[in-house]
Amino acid sequence: MEKVKFIVPGEPYGKGRPRFRIVGQFQQPYTPEKTATYENLIKLEYERQCHGKRYGKEDALGMFITAYKPIPSSTSKKKSRLMLDRLIFPGKKPDWDNIGKIYCDALNGIAFQDDTQIVDGRVVKLYAELPRVEVEIWRVGQNG
């Protein structure tokens, strides 16, 4: 399968830390609702745009994620231009690694069998007038 590309509209969101609840004498971990909702959005957009394409379990994969954050409304026109020209980068949350993690986890069993297949990955955070996340996945070699 060739490279696949898809876009998730809206502001980028990073993987939230698991929460714990007490059930009897035990602590039970659970995924925060906002994280679960965003993972479902990723899955839906992948299925809709990539038509259920799935890489084989032996494929070594690369993933490139570009997260476009909105320019804050209080930003001057001069500073906005610098942000759009990629001279100022988003230094705020979500962290780049949490963005990558939520996409890898959401696409487990959807685009690929397991996120351990990702051997080459990169996340870039930029500013844009239209917030979104663009994702590319490709085969980088054959295992076995």
Residue ranges and their predicted role:
Residues 1-144:
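Acidic, proline/glycine-enriched N-terminal capping motif
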